[in-house]
């Protein structure tokens, strides 16, 4: 179910608002976003957004990317200590399965939080090179964070467990996936 984060009725917002007020802290969580007029207004020019996508000729292939806008995003919302929506971040680099329902977000962003500093929220695949076809040496997200002196990087994600790890993990759920750790 796609949610509009600007309607205080969304399930994710209601949960985060309750948690943030109870704990008096900032809370971030991912959710599937239905684009609203407010969403599209936020896509105007800004000095804190960075479109890290590469020109087509720099990638081997971008065939898995959507050809038509879907008006939906793989997003994460930041809710403040008073329970109010502070910002919505949208996944910039889509994983293949995301392209079946979501559009690419407009770019990496950050927000200044009082007494905390610059916070960047990126989602899962944003950590990888764009479309997995460009060089792993480009480090788009970390370059953005370094260039903008980001203090905190928050990354909600749902890592896929390598098939060879499934039996091992089921034996001892407290043990990490070594191939995943080695990948990063």
Describe each model-derived feature in a short phrase:
Residues 7-29, 128-184:
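CN hydrolase (nitrilase-like) catalytic-core segments centered on the catalytic cysteine
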Residues 101-109, 121-123, 132-146:
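A Trp-anchored, charged/polar loop motif used as the substrate-binding/catalytic surface
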């Amino acid at each position: 179910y796609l949610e509009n984060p600007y309607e205080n009725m969304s399930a994710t917002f209601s949960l985060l608002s309750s948690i943030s007020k109870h704990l008096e802290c900032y809370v971030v969580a991912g959710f599937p976003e239905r684009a609203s007029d407010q969403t599209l207004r936020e896509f105007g020019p800004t000095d804190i957004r960075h479109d890290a996508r590469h020109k087509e000729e720099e990638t081997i292939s971008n065939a898995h990317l959507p050809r038509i806008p879907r008006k939906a995003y793989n997003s994460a919302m930041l809710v403040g200590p008073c329970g109010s929506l502070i910002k919505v971040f949208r996944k910039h680099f889509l994983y293949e399965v995301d392209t079946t329902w979501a559009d690419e977000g407009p770019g990496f962003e950050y927000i200044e939080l009082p007494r905390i500093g610059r916070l960047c929220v990126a989602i899962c695949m944003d950590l990888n090179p764009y479309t997995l076809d460009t060089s792993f040496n480009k480090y788009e997200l970390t370059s953005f964070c370094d260039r903008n002196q980001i203090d905190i990087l928050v990354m909600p994600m749902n890592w896929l467990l390598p098939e060879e790890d499934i039996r091992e993990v089921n034996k001892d759920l407290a043990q990490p996936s070594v191939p995943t750790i080695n990948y990063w």
